Amino acid sequence: MSQHPSRPALIALLLAACLLVSGNALATDLDDEIPSQRPEVQSFIDEMVQKHGFDRATLNQQFAQVRMKQKIVDAITRPAESKPWFEYRPIFVTQTRIKEGVKFWNAHEAELQRAEAEYGVPPEIIVAILGVETRYGRHHGGWRVMDALSTLAFAYPKRAAFFRGELEQYLLLTREEGLDPLAVMGSYAGAMGKAQFISSSYRNFAVDFDGDGKRDLWDNTADAIGSVANYFKRHNWQPGAPVGSPAMVGSNRISRLLKEGIKPHTPVKELRKQGVTALQPLPPEAPAALIAFEKKVGRPDYWLGLNNFYVITRYNHSPLYAMAVYQLGEAIKEQRRD
């Protein structure tokens, strides 16, 4: 038998090699590329000048110092939320993070109580958000926000429109707040500060909670606490209402109910008629959504998520994120009570 590959096999091998080389070249080319060389960046600069009155020379100078990074594109294609629940939960709901949350709550009890009084959002939710996002303000991200947003706006077609909008919001934000756009650090997605607000959220929902005249989510814990609470209030958090409940499912309609999504759609009492029973008391008229959380072995854990669960997903659209926040907050509250 001949040991030489067939002609089709050779063609396939050559194509694979070309793809590999071109992929590596793309990664190499993108790293440290100066985006101002791209025509779409010049179009963006034109828009910022015409629409918002920015100085063209200043923007050209700033974009000449921006460096695009392949690692940013790589990171956004591998978010933690792509993991199954049984791998995701142990990242965030840990004894260390619970203890740190108790300590944070005790240190900032006055601000948390004031935030609850003003916005209706309980301390455990605010604390858990800050715990999941930045380990209570310790890890803000190691990327220049200008690099991150420019990379995603001009080299990540899947979400280019969104990040182009966030880059616009970022330049407006830094102008309004008197910040150097090339000096601000954040996440690979351009989220900033203790609360990891993206630029549009910072402009719309950040508050000066301590009254010092600045909205500072990097160094001012009071502002971070107040801003998270304001974000939840503005997204229709219902004070005193439950977040959700574990559920017992004895229905052959599970697939259909799960396909309805995470936005509450059916009253609890109607779901009960369809074989889905909350294991904790819930208002019978409250709309709910059935959500499954994958276990390593066996059937998933089923939960009914109510309005406040959905509100948590407005901070991060993943139900895994919302459940991690809820469970971390409950664990912190329980341990603090003991």
Predicted regions and their residues:
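Acidic, glycine-anchored loop motifs typical of Ca2+
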Residues: 209-217
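An acidic, Gly/Ser/Thr/Pro-rich helix-cap/linker signature
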Residues: 28-116
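Short, functionally critical alpha-helical segments immediately adjacent to catalytic or ligand/cofactor-binding
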Residues: 59-68, 122-137, 170-172, 228-229
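Secretory-pathway/luminal and periplasmic proteins that interact with or process carbohydrate-rich
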Residues: 68-75, 134-144, 155-160, 176-182, ...
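C-terminal soluble interaction/assembly domains
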Residues: 250-338
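Bacterial N-terminal signal peptides that target proteins for export
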Residues: 2-12
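Bacterial N-terminal signal peptides
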Residues: 11-22
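Substrate-binding/active-site groove segments that recognize
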Residues: 145-154, 192-207, 228
